[in-house]
Amino acid sequence: MIARIWSGESPLWRLLLPLSWLYGLVSGAIRLSYKLGFKRAWRAPVPVVVVGNLTAGGNGKTPVVIWLVEKLQQRGVRVGVVSRGYGGKAAAYPLLLTPETTTAEAGDEPVLIYQRTGAPVAVAPERAAAVKAILAAHNVQIIITDDGLQHYRLARDIEIVVIDGVRRFGNGWWLPAGPMRERASRLKTVDAAIVNGGVARAGEIPMQLAPGLAVNLRTGARCDVAQLSNIVAMAGIGHPPRFFATLEACGAHPQKCVPLADHQTLAPADVQALVGEGQTLVMTEKDAVKCRAFAEDNWWFLPVDARLSGEQPDKLLQHITSLVR
């Protein structure tokens, strides 16, 4: 229903317009207060790069963060990552991730980024506190914040927006009548707009999510996902249909697709109940970090990597590395 409202297919969005106007006025006033200096943002002693969205819902932001961290690491840059830690609840904040940190404490995306990149990762509702925790424990040269475009309390040097190239901005309205956290005109002020799928427009960086080999959660064995049979697909991400379409494109044809809420807590019994005798469970990598501790032999995940095309990605990386002292 939400997808139909935000796309404009359902007329119910009109009933939510008063709340959307209120949301837009409040969010605009907050941004203006920082822009005019009525409120002060905290500036870190190292450059800060924000990777965020203008819309609610999954746009492919986490793969972009991983891509950016890995590309900077390849250039010899010491990178730290901060996040709000959605879906997690730590005993105390800021929380600096360790190999023992669970998704229940830090959230699924921070744990995934930590495991994929090995970069220092910290979570806190107040992102400045997370930055300070990393700087106190690690000699990093740059901070990447996973989400937080609208978190103006943290000053930033580079802003990168990730856009779903198929859904783009839906009906164009602020939450809750539409998907917008800020108006599309905000694109004029960011440093880069990366478009996941669909057709990129002038000045935007095209991106595709490239699937790798399926990985067994228990053994680490790898195989072409099309070789798996009797698949039940599970996706607890911002836009589950994207994952199901990826499986189809890879030649894997699920018998059943189970969409879950983004950052949803997964109980062992609930996940086990999805898979019948002789079936194979295939999930996203973000779900896998929550399920690995209780995984069965026939559970697999399909990793995806961001692939950015054209000359603009290299120019963006050069611009970012030029800020590093």
Curated annotation (Swiss-Prot):
GO molecular function, one term: ATP binding
SUPFAM superfamilies: P-loop containing nucleoside triphosphate hydrolases (SSF52540)
Keyword Repeat: no
GO process terms (BP): lipid A biosynthetic process; lipopolysaccharide core region biosynthetic process
Domain of life assignment: Bacteria
Record-level GO cellular component terms: plasma membrane
InterPro entries (UniProt xref): LpxK, P-loop_NTPase
EC number: 2.7.1.130
Keywords: ATP-binding, Kinase, Lipid A biosynthesis, Lipid biosynthesis, Lipid metabolism, Nucleotide-binding, Transferase
UniProt pathway annotation: Glycolipid biosynthesis; lipid IV(A) biosynthesis; lipid IV(A) from (3R)-3-hydroxytetradecanoyl-[acyl-carrier-protein] and UDP-N-acetyl-alpha-D-glucosamine: step 6/6
Keyword check for Transcription: no
Reaction(s) the record says it catalyses: a lipid A disaccharide + ATP = a lipid IVA + ADP + H(+)
Residues given in the record as ATP binding sites: T55, A56, G57, G58, N59, G60, K61, T62
Functional summary from the UniProt entry: Transfers the gamma-phosphate of ATP to the 4'-position of a tetraacyldisaccharide 1-phosphate intermediate (termed DS-1-P) to form tetraacyldisaccharide 1,4'-bis-phosphate (lipid IVA).
Protein family membership: Belongs to the LpxK family.
NCBIfam families given in the database record: lpxK
PANTHER family: TETRAACYLDISACCHARIDE 4'-KINASE, TETRAACYLDISACCHARIDE 4'-KINASE, MITOCHONDRIAL-RELATED
Protein name in UniProt: Tetraacyldisaccharide 4'-kinase
Gene transcribed to yield this protein: lpxK
